[in-house]
A protein has these predicted regions:
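Conserved active-site tyrosine of GNAT-family acetyltransferases
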Residues: 44-49, 114, 142
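Short, conserved beta-strand/loop elements in beta-sheet-dominated catalytic cores
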Residues: 145-146
């Protein structure tokens, strides 16, 4: 019985450590860069640079790497079936099951700027019970983009 109790205590302690965010071997510097496989590199570049103010970090004939206006985050786009890429990265995005969230300081300002530019608003600006104020647009690939300001509750 004492051995079983010790085993239970050790298991509970291990579970508690796992839930507290104690660093694992996978911890350390990680940077996420989402990539979308698409035929629409030119349209995508024009949308993200002219509508959202992104900059071009790198581009060639089959790859486009863009960064947010503050340079902190990046997103990439790749032509499908490109011979330089492995088969895992050949299939094009199918315009479903993906969205991006862009956190901004002043969602109302951006909302009005995009309306003035004639950008189609897919979800009108609104407040949510959980504290977000947001609206959504769609990029040329069919990706929903949720622009959000977290408000105080």
């Amino acid at each position: 019985m004492k051995r079983l109790l010790t085993l239970v205590v050790v298991c509970l302690a291990s579970c508690a450590l796992a839930q507290t965010g104690t660093p694992s071997k996978l911890q350390g510097k990680m940077k996420l860069n989402a990539g979308i496989v698409t035929e629409k590199l030119e349209e995508t570049k024009a949308f993200y640079t002219s509508v959202l103010g992104f900059g071009v970090s790198f581009e060639n004939e089959f790859y486009l790497l863009l960064h947010t206006p503050n340079g902190e985050d990046e997103i990439s786009f790749l032509l499908p079936n490109h011979p330089s890429q492995q088969a895992l990265f050949h299939k094009p995005f199918q315009q479903q099951g993906l969205y991006l969230t862009i956190e901004v300081d002043e969602v109302d300002q951006i909302y009005h700027e995009l309306k003035k530019k004639g950008v189609e608003i897919e979800i009108d600006i609104r407040d949510e019970a959980w504290g977000d104020r947001h609206f959504a647009i769609q990029d040329p690939n069919g990706i929903g983009i949720d622009l959000v300001t977290h408000t105080k509750q």
